[in-house]
């Protein structure tokens, strides 16, 4: 469940703190009808096999500033820059060999991308099924005489639209 992300965002702005939203287990969740991951400076999402959608492995980072986008693009490709501005800065170097950051090989394969894109199209359906499953579990436990007083469930605030990967149960 989402905290009041607007309050967190506003606090971060006042204190000049970069807000990175970890949404690895809440892809598709919303706060006040706006997707989580879009309130901060960066939003992270996971496509691990057990999450809301999968591409087998990997994930996604979103950001608001073009400068941050260029840095992230470089980091995911061994620190390599494909930016024309960098090429102009080092005209005597072959741009295929200009590495401006330490980086990683985090580029998805074409197959992973195709799987991920097809899964994105089903995200809202998956989110709806997970919500229905949560309700079925809660109703089943509440209707069982043996268990109905053993479990307590967290109420979902009206301004939150979860994307359940898991949900808390209080014993």
Give the location of each predicted region:
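PLP-dependent aminotransferase class I/II
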Residues: 1-14, 30, 66-171
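Active-site phosphate-binding strand-loop segment of PLP-dependent enzymes
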Residues: 1-55, 60-68
């Amino acid at each position: 469940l989402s905290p009041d992300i607007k309050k967190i965002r506003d606090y971060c702005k006042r204190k000049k703190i970069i807000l990175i939203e970890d949404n690895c287990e809440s892809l598709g969740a919303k706060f006040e009808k706006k997707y989580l991951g879009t309130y901060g400076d960066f939003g992270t999402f996971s496509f691990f096999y057990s999450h809301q959608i999968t591409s087998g492995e990997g994930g996604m980072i979103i950001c608001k500033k073009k400068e941050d986008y260029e840095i992230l693009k470089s980091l995911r490709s061994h620190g390599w820059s494909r930016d024309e501005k960098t090429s102009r800065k080092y005209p005597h170097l072959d741009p295929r060999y200009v590495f401006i950051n330490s980086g990683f090989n985090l580029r998805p394969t074409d197959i992973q991308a195709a799987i991920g894109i097809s899964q994105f199209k089903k995200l809202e359906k998956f989110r709806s099924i997970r919500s229905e499953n949560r309700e079925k579990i809660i109703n089943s436990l509440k209707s069982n005489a043996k268990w109905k007083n053993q479990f307590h469930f967290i109420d979902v605030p009206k301004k939150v639209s979860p994307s359940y990967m898991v949900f808390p149960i209080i014993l």
